[in-house]
Every structure is written in structure tokens, then in C-alpha cells.
């Protein structure tokens, strides 16, 4: 029965599919919002006519892409589908809680969308800083609805994190240690730990903001002995681990894709990859104030946060060079998934380099809140996280559906997307260096050229998104059934065929220990 299967599901594959579909739909909404932003900035003068509505669109774009596209697809979609299969578990540890984690997201999304329908909407930026997010600058229910939306999304992620940690630690076959699990499983576990430790801090911060707005507390109001900078510390203590939460599962997927299409049976430097992810996870918690170099911190504090931020480049570099070493000497298959992975490595590295530039507190004081920052994090998100999602999707699509994509269309899609995102975000480095500030709906004529090129690029990306919908339709309509998958001995998730049966590993898997 349809309702029993899809509403009350306790099956990790079905819930993973729900996450995928929800994330894809939210991704369309987020893309639409980004097109509105680039349409407004395509030429000087005003299109939407109102700075408040522009900022509402920018804020919604960020929230939708982060909480309803990247996280549901990477952690909820790929995580649910692949983690139990990769460790030989029959399902997740808490299957009903898994269902609840998913069904908290649509109401959360509804609250976010409704926040833009009441009063003037929440035009605060995704950081929701007071006093702009206070009840004076944002009277009405908009920001409150946004806060409740974040609460629900946060509870969803925390429950999911508990579920993944328990599953990965507890549900492996007795014979295998944690250091024999695939890198994607490691990446999801580390991501889950980051979620578990960082989200409660965000919840605390936005709950205090909620009481400041509605119950006359003064946590962030100097008039009552509060401090708006406290909010920034609480937010970024969550916000920085969050950006690693968005990219770590991508690291795991890229490791699998690069290994597979290089014809290797294991990635280069497995232990180094694991330790690099653990280091990134740990360091992600002790660098948060690099988002706050302009609030007037002591020089020694700035020196610490600059150095600590630069240290993160080391484990990240370990990962990049290990991917390149995995490619080395391989029998490389230029499949669409491999193209996405290679694009990821190249563009993520560029994003990482601009991150090193921004980690210098003195430089950041000039570049903070300019388009240089926008360019930086879109290189690691729009070309890091999204490329990893696309690579993972085209790689595992036969596993999820049992059908094959059209290779030629998939490669064309990659090419259009690659051109589009680079044309959109590369010029923004120049805008930032020339001093164009973020979160403004208009700009002096001097910035016209690069903005126009950037907006053209965004429409090319939109074309790629629409083409992707066609490619998925084409695959599901043509029904080219998967015949056989090579290398299943080192890729456990493919062992049960494509697609795998509804229940897998109902009896505990017997793992023969090969290294003894």
C-alpha cells in the first residue's frame, strides 16, 4: 500500500529515496531563488524594487540550499542508502526515528517559506544577526518562523546524527574493525559527530534570540547588559562546523568515485584519509572566530584564529594529494561520475586557496563582506558539495534505480554545468577585490561588466539543472536495465544487484578477514 510504504516507512532505502526527492525539489527552489538574485544583479538599477525583498531572497536561498538541499541529499539520501549496505547492516539502528528525521523536514521547509509570506519576510541573511534580527528592525513573525524552521531542521539532523553514529559503531559485522569500513562510512560518522556537537549551540543561540524578540530578555541587547557579539560566537561555533558537515560526506563520495573509475581496489593512503577527516572535524570546532575578524578582537586572538585556520589546509591537502595519488597509474575510465570527481578536485582546491587568502586576519578585514567571500564559499559549495552530489548521483544511480543514465547526455550536462558555475563565480573574485560589498541589490556602474558576466553564467547553470531533469526522465523512461557491475568485491554496496532487494543482509554478513 502506497501510504504504508512511503509515509510510515522504516526502510533505509525508501527513506533515502524520500530524502533524495525532497532534496532535489528543494534544490529547484534554491536554484530559482539564486536566479532571482542574479537577475537583480545582472545590470545596475533595480529589478525587484525593494532591498528588503532582495535580502529575503538571499536569506531563503542560503537556508534552502544548506538545510533542505545539500544536507538532506548527502547525509539523508546517500547516507541512508549507502551506509547500511557498505557495512553489511540490515537497516539503520533506529528505523522509525529515521522516518521521523525525514518527516520533520517538510514542516520545517513550510515554516521557512511561510516566514517570507508574513510581514516583510526575514531579510536578515542566513546568519540572523541581532539587532537586525531583533523585534525592532524585524517586527512581526517572519524571523520567529525562520527560527522555528531552524529548530525543526536541527532536531531532524540531531536525530539523524544519533542514528548514524549508533549504526556505524554498533551494526558492523563482528569481524571488521572501524578501520576496515569504507571512507564514505567514515565521512558520514565524522559528519554526524560534528552535527551532534554543533547544532545544540545553534539551538541555544536562536532560542535566546527568540526570547529576546518575544519575552523581553536581553541576551543580545546592550541596554540590558547583553552583547550582540555573543550571538555571533554562538552562531559561528555552529556555522563553521556546518560548512565541514556540508563537504565531508562529499569527500567520502569523491574517494569512492576516484578509486572506482581509476580501476583501483582501494584509495591511496586509507589511514591518512581517515585521520585527515578526523583532523578536519576536530579543527573545524576551534576556528569559528575567523568569521568575526572585523568585530574588533585582540591582535593575539586574531593571530590564533589565523594560524588555526591555516592548519586546516594541511589535512585538506592530504586528501587532495591522496586523490591524485589514487588516480596515478590507474586505468582511468572517463565516465560522467569521474568527470564530476575531477572537476570537484580542481574547483574545490581553488576554493581552498581563496580560503587561505581569507584566513589572514589583516587581508580579511579588507575582504570581509565583499564578493570575494561569496566567490570563496561558492567554489567550495556550488562546485565542491554540488559536484560531489552530482558525481555520487550519476555513479550510484544504477544502484538506486536499476537503470543506466545516457552517458553522452550526462557528459554534456557536466560540461554545461562546469562552464556555468565557473562563469558565475570566477568574476566575483574580481568584484570582491575591487570592493563590491555583499547583500546589496544594486551597485555603482564600475562593477557592471563582471556582474553581467556572472549573471549570464548563472543562466547557463540553470540550463544544466533543467537538462538534468530531462536526463533523469530519459533514464527512467528508457529503462535500460543494468547488466553487471565490475569490482563488487571491494564495493560491498553493489553486491546484491541493481537495485538491491527491499531487505538486504537479513542474516549477519560473514566477512572473511583477508589481512591475517
Swiss-Prot record:
Tell me which Gene Ontology terms the entry assigns under biological process. electron transport coupled proton transport; mitochondrial electron transport, cytochrome c to oxygen
Originating organism: Cratogeomys neglectus (Queretaro pocket gopher)
- Membrane topology term: Multi-pass membrane protein
Transmembrane annotation, as ranges: 12-40, 51-86, 95-117, 141-170, 183-212, 228-261, 270-286, 299-327, 336-357, 371-400, 407-433, 447-478
Which positions does UniProt annotate for Na(+) binding? 40, 45, 441
Q: What class of enzyme is it?
A: translocase
Q: Which residues does the entry place in the Mitochondrial matrix compartment?
A: 1-11, 87-94, 171-182, 262-269, 328-335, 401-406, 479-516
Q: What is the lineage of its organism?
A: Eukaryota, Metazoa, Chordata, Craniata, Vertebrata
Q: What is this protein called?
A: Cytochrome c oxidase subunit 1
Task: Report if keyword Oxidoreductase is assigned.
Answer: no
Q: Which key words are in the record? A: Calcium, Copper, Electron transport, Heme, Iron, Magnesium, Membrane, Metal-binding, Mitochondrion, Mitochondrion inner membrane, Respiratory chain, Sodium, Translocase, Transmembrane, Transmembrane helix, Transport
One cellular component term from this protein's GO annotations in UniProt: respiratory chain complex IV
Member of which family?
Belongs to the heme-copper respiratory oxidase family.
How many cofactors are bound and how? Binds 2 heme A groups non-covalently per subunit. Binds a copper B center.
**Binding-site residues, O2:** 244
Residues reported to bind Fe(II)-heme a: 61, 378
Stored PANTHER family: CYTOCHROME C OXIDASE SUBUNIT 1 (PTHR10422:SF18)
Where is the 1'-histidyl-3'-tyrosine (His-Tyr) crosslink found in the sequence? 240-244
Q: What PROSITE patterns would the database entry show?
A: COX1, COX1_CUB
| Substrates-to-products reaction catalysed | 4 Fe(II)-[cytochrome c] + O2 + 8 H(+)(in) = 4 Fe(III)-[cytochrome c] + 2 H2O + 4 H(+)(out)
CDD domains xref list? Cyt_c_Oxidase_I
Q: Which residues lie on this side of the membrane: Mitochondrial intermembrane?
A: 41-50, 118-140, 213-227, 287-298, 358-370, 434-446
Which positions bind Cu cation? 240, 290-291
- Give the subcellular location: Mitochondrion inner membrane
Q: Which cofactors?
A: heme; Cu cation
Amino acid at each position: 500500500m502506497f501510504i504504508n510504504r512511503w509515509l510510515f516507512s522504516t526502510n533505509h532505502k525508501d527513506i533515502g529515496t524520500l530524502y533524495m526527492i525532497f532534496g532535489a525539489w528543494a534544490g529547484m527552489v534554491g536554484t530559482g531563488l539564486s536566479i532571482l538574485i542574479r537577475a537583480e544583479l545582472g545590470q545596475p538599477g533595480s529589478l525587484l524594487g525593494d532591498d528588503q525583498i532582495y535580502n529575503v531572497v538571499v536569506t531563503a536561498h542560503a537556508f534552502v540550499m544548506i538545510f533542505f538541499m545539500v544536507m538532506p541529499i548527502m547525509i539523508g539520501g546517500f547516507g541512508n542508502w549507502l551506509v547500511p549496505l557498505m557495512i553489511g547492516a540490515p537497516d539503520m539502528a533506529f528505523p522509525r526515528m529515521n522516518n521521523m528525521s525525514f518527516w520533520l523536514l517538510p514542516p520545517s521547509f513550510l515554516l521557512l517559506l511561510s516566514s517570507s509570506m508574513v510581514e516583510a519576510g526575514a531579510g536578515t541573511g542566513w546568519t540572523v544577526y541581532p539587532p537586525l534580527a531583533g523585534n525592532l528592525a524585524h517586527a512581526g513573525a517572519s524571523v520567529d518562523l525562520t527560527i522555528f524552521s531552524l529548530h525543526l531542521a536541527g532536531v531532524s539532523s540531531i536525530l539523524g546524527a544519533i542514528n548514524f553514529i549508533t549504526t556505524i559503531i554498533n551494526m558492523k559485522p563482528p569481524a571488521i574493525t572501524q578501520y576496515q569500513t569504507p571512507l564514505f562510512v567514515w565521512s558520514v560518522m565524522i559528519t554526524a559527530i560534528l552535527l551532534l556537537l554543533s547544532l545544540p549551540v545553534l539551538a541555544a543561540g536562536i532560542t535566546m534570540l527568540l526570547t529576546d524578540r518575544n519575552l523581553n530578555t536581553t541576551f543580545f541587547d546592550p541596554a540590558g547588559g547583553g552583547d550582540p557579539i555573543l550571538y555571533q560566537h554562538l552562531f559561528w561555533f555552529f556555522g563553521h562546523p556546518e560548512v565541514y558537515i556540508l563537504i565531508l560526506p562529499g569527500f567520502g563520495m569523491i574517494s569512492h568515485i576516484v578509486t572506482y573509475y581509476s580501476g583501483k581496489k582501494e584509495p591511496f593512503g586509507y589511514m591518512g584519509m581517515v585521520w585527515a577527516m578526523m583532523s578536519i572535524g576536530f579543527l573545524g570546532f576551534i576556528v569559528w572566530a575567523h568569521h568575526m575578524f572585523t568585530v574588533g578582537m585582540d591582535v593575539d586572538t586574531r593571530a590564533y584564529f589565523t594560524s588555526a585556520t591555516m592548519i586546516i589546509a594541511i589535512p585538506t591537502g592530504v586528501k587532495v594529494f591522496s586523490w591524485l595519488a589514487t588516480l596515478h597509474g590507474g586505468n582511468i575510465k572517463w565516465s560522467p561520475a569521474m568527470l564530476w570527481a575531477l572537476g570537484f578536485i580542481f574547483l574545490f582546491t581553488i576554493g581552498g586557496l581563496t580560503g587561505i587568502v581569507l584566513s589572514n586576519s589583516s587581508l580579511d578585514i579588507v575582504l570581509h563582506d565583499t564578493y570575494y567571500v561569496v566567490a570563496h564559499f561558492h567554489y567550495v559549495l556550488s562546485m565542491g558539495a554540488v559536484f560531489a552530489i552530482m558525481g555520487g548521483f550519476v555513479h550510484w544511480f544504477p544502484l538506486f534505480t536499476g537503470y543506466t543514465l545516457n552517458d553522452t547526455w550526462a557528459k554534456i550536462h557536466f560540461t554545461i554545468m562546469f562552464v556555468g558555475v565557473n562563469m558565475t563565480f570566477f568574476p566575483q573574485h574580481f568584484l570582491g577585490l575591487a570592493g563590491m560589498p555583499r547583500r546589496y541589490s544594486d551597485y555603482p556602474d564600475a562593477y557592471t561588466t563582471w556582474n553581467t558576466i556572472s549573471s549570464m553564467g548563472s543562466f547557463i547553470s540553470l540550463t544544466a539543472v533543467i537538462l538534468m531533469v530531462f536526463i533523469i526522465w530519459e533514464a527512467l523512461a528508457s529503462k535500460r536495465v543494468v547488466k553487471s557491475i565490475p569490482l563488487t568485491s571491494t564495493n560491498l554496496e553493489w553486491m546484491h544487484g541493481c537495485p538491491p532487494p527491499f531487505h538486504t543482509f537479513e542474516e549477519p554478513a560473514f566477512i572473511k578477514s583477508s589481512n591475517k
